[in-house]
Amino acid sequence: MAPSSPRPALPALLVLLGALFPGPGNAQTSVSPPKVILPRGGSVQVTCSTSCDQPDLLGIETPLPKKELLLGGNNWKVYELSNVQEDSQPMCYSNCPDGQSTAKTFLTVYWTPERVELAPLPSWQPVGKDLTLRCQVEGGAPRANLTVVLLRGEKELKREPAVGEPAEVTTTVLVERDHHGANFSCRTELDLRPQGLQLFENTSAPHQLQTFVLPATPPQLVSPRVLEVDTQGTVVCSLDGLFPVLEAQVHLALGDQRLNPTVTYGNDSFSAKASVSVTAEDEGTQRLMCAVILGNQSRETLQTVTIYSFPAPNVILTKPEVSEGTEVTVKCEAHPRAKVTLNGVPAQPVGPRVQLLLKATPEDNGRSFSCSATLEVAGQLIHKNQTRELRVLYGPRLDERDCPGNWTWPENSQQTPMCQASGNPLPELKCLKDGTFPLPVGESVTVTRDLEGTYLCRARSTQGEVTRKVTVNVLSPRYEIVIITVVAAAVIMGTAGLSTYLYNRQRKIRKYRLQQAQKGTPMKPNTQATPP
């Protein structure tokens, strides 16, 4: 049997010959539809026909998978072309008695991009700086109908045709505060509406932009420059002009000690307040730091805090309680670098120690000895004080001031006898008349004749005893009348004497003036007038 392998090549050869040397006849080959747009991987039915009734050959030339359908007639055939992956131009051919001819159909494949991706945005972007948006698109056809759009929310920022593989579209945006939290994305539009289809859109995953404003000025840090061991201080850090202020992170630390501040926010400012405690391990110069972090930037302020130990000065008495006449040494000692004064008297030479010698007297009982120490720390003067009291033991005292020796009271009047003994310890006081009748010292009493007399007041303590006589005189009413009469007579006599003195004085003055007048003017005889 003759081999049949040359037969498949015959249609292609006829097509080629028909294209190069078209026949002189009027036979025509046609194809339907002449243009087709279909999705990638799709199928299409193509009808090839010829104008002659009995063609020797009628077919289609294409690299696509094809299948001749049972439909058809003598001068036309229907083929199904499948798995169309790219643009193609299948060609129908025919060989008729009066010549060969061909006809092409144009298959256009469309498909949306396989990758639409917006390049990642910075985690934070400063306000006032340019931001570059970059979108990459892989795949998609037909490219003539494919457009790339960059968006902020739904607002278009830039639109360009997709060119190249991959296609890349970029634009620059000046970042504003209003852009904080905005979503940026990239969208492709495959517009096949002119071909009777629809608009196909693919959108990338959105990226949210975070913007910020962090002023160039460092935060303001307020803190004590010196801090004593085992005490607490307050640190305040603040900064204005922040956006968004709630996103700002504040870090406060003293040396290796992280502080826990309480942060108060304003519209565009914050204030962080923290307490700091120091111990003996922190003594020395420590670094205090306040750092503000916003976005990908930070601002910080550093200060030094001097931690010091300065116990109160120590006041030492030979004994806190001594007897009268005892010599007492008072010492004041303080920090080795301190300068001390004792009762206002500085140490000589100036230093951390001073002492005072004295002989205890009753006036020293209850006397306070105050030691003041001054220490310079980081240019500041720190003052500490300590006080001790001296108690002096001395015997009882009864003097005229506190216990008058004579009282004179009207009978039946209300009086309070006062007699107070001094001494340390406070002595016991008793005032007795005739050894038995007590004087009600400190009590309000009605004065009677029984109260009159001389009392012996005795003050006694562990330091000794002292006595004093006190006399009480009681004035009865009859004595009062005599006194009143005497006083009245004295007043009358005094008044009469004064009147006599004044009268004689005036008389002498008149006599003197008369004598002076007679010396200056001669006397004239009195002449009796002649009666008419």
Curated annotation (Swiss-Prot):
Pfam families: ICAM1_3_5_D2, ICAM_N. Its main location: membrane. InterPro entries: ICAM, ICAM1_3_5_D2, ICAM_N, ICAM_VCAM, ICAM_VCAM_N, Ig-like_dom, Ig-like_dom_sf, Ig-like_fold. One of its GO terms (biological process) is cell-cell adhesion. A motif (Cell attachment site) lies at residues 152-154. Residues 28-480 are extracellular. The gene is ICAM1. Monoubiquitinated, which is promoted by MARCH9 and leads to endocytosis. GO terms for cellular component: plasma membrane. It comes from the Eukaryota. Keywords: Cell adhesion, Disulfide bond, Glycoprotein, Immunoglobulin domain, Membrane, Phosphoprotein, Repeat, Signal, Transmembrane, Transmembrane helix, Ubl conjugation. Residues 41-103, 128-193, 230-297, 325-378, 412-464 form the Ig-like C2-type domain. It comes from Pan paniscus. Residues 504-532 are cytoplasmic. This is Intercellular adhesion molecule 1.
